[in-house]
Amino acid sequence: MRGILKKISQINFGLMSPEDIRKMSVTQIVTPDTYDEDGYPIENGLMDPRLGVIDPSLRCRTCGAKGGECPGHFGSINLARPVIHVGFADTIHKILRSTCRKCGRVLLTETEIEEYRQRILDAMEKEESLTPIIKEIYAEARRDKCPHCEEEQEEIKLDKPVSIVEGDYKLTPSEVRERLERISDDDALILGVNPEVARPEWMVLTVLPVPPVTVRPSITLETGERSEDDLTHKLVDILRINQRLKENMEAGAPQLIVEDLWELLQYHVTTYFDNEASGVPPARHRSGRPLKTLAQRLKGKEGRFRSNLSGKRVNFSARTVISPDPNISINEVGVPEIIAREVTVPVYVTEWNIDRMREYIENGPDVHPGANYVIRPDGRKIRIYNETKEVVLENLKPGYIVERHLKDGDIVLFNRQPSLHRMSMMAHQVRVLPYKTFRLNLCVCPPYNADFDGDEMNMHVFQTEESRAEAKTLMRVQEHILSPRFGGPIIGGIHDHISGAYLLTRKSAVFSEEKVFQILKKAGLPLPDSRGRDWTGKEIFSMVLPDDLNMVYRAEVCRKCEECLEMECENDAYVVIENGQLISGVIDEKAYGAFAGKILDHIVKEYGTDAAREFLDSATKLAIAGIMHAGFTTSTNDEEIPEEARERIEAHLRNAEARVDQLIEAYENGELEPLPGRSLEETLEMKIMQVLGEARDKSGEIAESYFDMDENHAVIMALTGARGSMLNLTQITACVGQQSVRGGRISRGYDNRTLPHFKKGELGAKSRGFVHSSYKEGLDPIEFFFHAMGGREGLVDTAIRTAQSGYMQRRLVNALQDLTVDENGRVVDNRGVIIQNRFGEDGVDPAKSDYGKIVDLDKLVEEIRLKSKG
């Protein structure tokens, strides 16, 4: 029987009255025990069969359903004395502070009450927040004298978590409840309690609802013992103390004993609701582990909302380590066969595909491509085994669904956590490959922020035709080459792709025709007609460029000369492409690198994403073939400089240290002029930092002048943007430089000095963290210590920044998740409230912009000039 579907129009939150709790309850719970000796639930105990059943062999005594089908039913415990609900302690405190201790009226005049009532009713009608009005009322109603009965009021304090103290007297929950009962419905509304769904005195409990057994199931351990849920443990404590309190009250026990037991009951009820309430020791197991009670089930990352509602575990997904594969397309993902055999795609059997489906069923679950299940038209699912194959094949007809293995060309979602932006989850096409790791094209690493040092990634397989079509259209990797953050390519060549392209296209790169054909074959590119002569690397690279491409730009290797020599550039950094031919310039990061690739950016915007994918696939394969042909290796010999260079660097650093000593002397003699807005000490520090910074840069320049750009592979990597920078090489070869902590020189440590090896008050370069040595020659112990201080700050800073930005992201996502751009280009929320009249104030999609600019005029003019020249 199908249920009647109803649409939820609104949700109201209120409080349950004691009568509601009793009405909802199917039985009163009085026995603190759970099961008898035979293992059956005890009547009126915490596992009473009327509260629902979890054992599949038993039936619920309330609804008659079996375990697994019964939703469970509430019970109730009548408390011997009232207790305060810890969740409402703050509200009770505010209400008591704002009402008269004698007559129970709000401490406002009739005129004020009427005015506030009207404001509240208006806000309720407009569905606006009442919080600011209620806050204002609580602040206004803190008066020493009741305007209605002239009674003097005493100071009421909340002693966390639930003790209410008036003056020096601690109010009992019964007295608190009596006071709350005196408040009229009209006054309750003013205090933020809607009398239609709640009364203030219901915040003090007289009846405790007992949740159904389905909410707190007991488990059977391997030893055969039953282990109860934390909530059940807590309810046992509440029942025991409640029973003792009742017995002591009936026996006329001394007031002190009754009050102690009452306090204990309050403690157990408090920790039942929230075991992390401030000012209360948490209830623990015998092992010392704190109990996980109601609030802990809902709160935080492991709680119900974030762990089970916002995020769930899903079927049809796989996770394994990733490895690089430069030979698959950027749109593809290599899937291990073992995964392809396990994760399935449902396919409807039709008269057109029935023969293929038969083949899959014939192969069965162990041979790829096969099938694991068949679903009959009546919804019954049949697992395919070698024994059941024949029967399934006989009965197979259109209308059946076959759950087949993943095969080449299937569309899947691929994701790497943390998913910080749109491109952390993209659609790829499957390539089933041997071995046990996912294979990923290296160009797609930047958007996922992936590397291959043990990263794992997730794959999700679509189960419907609509989702596959949607993903293929909107989510394929090639649709995300341009980042919505800055309008440039985020997918592009990295590391070897860039070094390889440089080696292939530099001036000295000339190849025999035989070598050209070998390189093109290795790259999997079509072979051209023979030209009967040697080829330049530029001619080879031109084969992957679109025929009518015209561009001019300066490459990454450009040294920013004062006057650009253009085509005469000695570094070949002036790139000119005319009608798809690379006329001059080298190909490096600026051409097709992630974040910087100008050619790639141009192709995406002018020729579309299909052309961009083809270019990227071909160019990267060509670069890899080029680097394999040329050979590329690096070692510490690349950072070797002659003795003459070392002496020049040493002299320069000694000179800088002497200048620092002169500055310190001028400071000590009072001859140093302070900079505007700076103290003498700040001026000295700034000048020293400047001198030492210049010293490092200059020593780097000296070292750089001895490097050979043509043969030194470390320099090639740095200058082409493949990996690292010239600063890294400077530090390896010449001088590591000043270490900084909190943006300044190292100044803290021992009393008035950084280390006991220096004199007190010493301000010299060495004593404040200047590392004179280079990494290659090695640091002395003092330099090593200062270097570790600087590095430690970097590590701590990174860890803190990650946590802060993660929390910030969560808050932003939660706040902005319902904002959309409507068909008129306005930003609206899910209620239709307009946030912006034009998206981003200018209506421009950053992904379609030119690095943030709506149009790059210089680039356009240059292209038109080239076209007209052509």
Swiss-Prot record:
SUPFAM superfamilies from the UniProt entry: beta and beta-prime subunits of DNA dependent RNA-polymerase
Organism: Methanothermobacter thermautotrophicus (strain ATCC 29096 / DSM 1053 / JCM 10044 / NBRC 100330 / Delta H) (Methanobacterium thermoautotrophicum)
Catalytic activity, as annotated: RNA(n) + a ribonucleoside 5'-triphosphate = RNA(n+1) + diphosphate
Recorded coiled-coil stretches: none
Name of the protein: DNA-directed RNA polymerase subunit Rpo1N
Cofactor binding description: Binds at least 2 Zn(2+) per subunit.
A GO-annotated cellular component: cytoplasm
Function: DNA-dependent RNA polymerase (RNAP) catalyzes the transcription of DNA into RNA using the four ribonucleoside triphosphates as substrates. Forms the clamp head domain.
A Pfam family: RNA_pol_Rpb1_2
